Amino acid sequence: RMILNDGNGTYGRVLKPETVAALSQNGLGALKTPGWTTSMPNLANSGDFFPGFSKSWAYTFQVNDTALPTGRPAGSLSWAGIANSFYWIDRQTGLGGMWNTQILPFLDVSSWPGYVNFETTVYQHLAR
């Protein structure tokens, strides 16, 4: 919520708005974040978040460079945790979402599609 609120937390300002803007911008220049090949298949599958869509890395989060089929606009922030916990922060719309599981391996066949469906449903509901 603090990132969505330009640095304001529940009990007051945590970061300056210009700091939030800076930490949300591409920090790698022309480098893009590709998919990955696992070295530990018991913990993580090989994969890519939204293959075919350009993604870069801010100082804090992955940034999708283009709009995604879920409805998430370009410039939104996201990342994930090893037990299939995914989140996104859409500063343009003022929306954030989180999908938490405790399932291994990472990017398992049910968690990732569940998350994508959740995010898509949120944006479809907002479009009504």
PLM features: what roles do these ranges have?
Residues 1-128:
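Catalytic loop of the DD-peptidase/beta-lactamase superfamily, centered on the K-T-G motif
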